[in-house]
């Protein structure tokens, strides 16, 4: 009997040991876990968590924002895609059909948008146009009141001032054309390889406050990188002041957002009958899987959420500008313009209600002289990045790169103009702070792109859930 029990116990122990030996074959991580397991909880330098952003964006904000961006005021963007690259001459233009941009015919753009000046209210537009015409004729228009003349001069001065974070296009240039953003969506174009790497390499290596001795992880144009270089990079990054660290994270977040779009609207099928665009899971994994990217992918996605919070905060700060009664989304269609302003204000008030906004008061909060110097460096670095967009060889990528950098630049301009916004009069001309139509269109479309990225992350998370 004892021998039988001994045999049975031995058998059970053996089975147990076999089970332990196969412990490695327990259900492995899903692809979703490898991409998103670290993209949760609180974000660095923030008091907000990823889950709160997902819920707020995907269910309360995203649907209404998409409706607004489909309106005439926001779908037409004037851009000069023929500006020469200011940094190098050997640009390889992408010859693929999907890289091309189809500009609008003049009769496709609403008259109110095409008018000579469309930055402000209809009344202000007329006044500015009269002033510009008088200036061209070398005459003094005495019909304009002293207050109006002062306002016009302030507006003009402000547009040419040094507080802009972007190198903006001259929209009066004959090379500047209106583009319908809905007909030229941001998606995969096939523009990749050394030419695309060069753009991002210049942005990261020369414009993110990084010394040449610090090597960026997974840089395709650098060789012989290992774990020690990665550790050195993040030790350097954590040692930066909060402003410079935020700058890097904004650029990384923008890069990540663009890669999400390209993975979500990938050319899956191209036949003479039709083109089929959709989610490319493999492409997404190559860019964001924690194992395939040696831990970089999840970091990039967290930086995307950081970028979302920065632009969300800017929109909450600029609400008073859009609430002013003389501001309108002027296209010439009064009923539609009024409806769109109501929708715009609904969205902005929803944004203002977000409970965990980024606290920008920690920015530039030290010694005033040092803070001003740092702020100017911040502005000049970002302005330089906006100029690099003219070096992108794919015209559609250039279009969306210029729009999104101008949008982020406008968000930064808002965050650094808090006192000017607070001092705006409730009605009448605003001497110190205003936004041009170009800035408004780029601001909301850029945020729309980031909002779409956050929504697409939910889609990819669901698609990857059952893949190992």
Curated annotation (Swiss-Prot):
Residues found modified as Phosphoserine: 106, 143, 145
Keywords noted in UniProt: Apoptosis, Cell projection, Disulfide bond, Electron transport, Endoplasmic reticulum, FAD, Flavoprotein, Glycoprotein, Golgi apparatus, Membrane, Oxidoreductase, Phosphoprotein, Redox-active center, Secreted, Signal, Transport
EC number assigned by the record: 1.8.4.-
Cofactor needs: FAD
Top EC class of this enzyme: oxidoreductase
Name the record gives this protein: ERO1-like protein alpha
UniProt note on regulation of activity: Enzyme activity is tightly regulated to prevent the accumulation of reactive oxygen species in the endoplasmic reticulum. Reversibly down-regulated by the formation of disulfide bonds between the active site Cys-94 and Cys-131, and between Cys-99 and Cys-104. Glutathione may be required to regulate its activity in the endoplasmic reticulum.
Keyword Membrane: yes
InterPro entries documented for this protein: Ero1, ERO1-like_sf
PTM section of the record: The Cys-94/Cys-99 and Cys-394/Cys-397 disulfide bonds constitute the redox-active center. The Cys-94/Cys-99 disulfide bond may accept electron from P4HB and funnel them to the active site disulfide Cys-394/Cys-397. The regulatory Cys-99/Cys-104 disulfide bond stabilizes the other regulatory bond Cys-94/Cys-131.
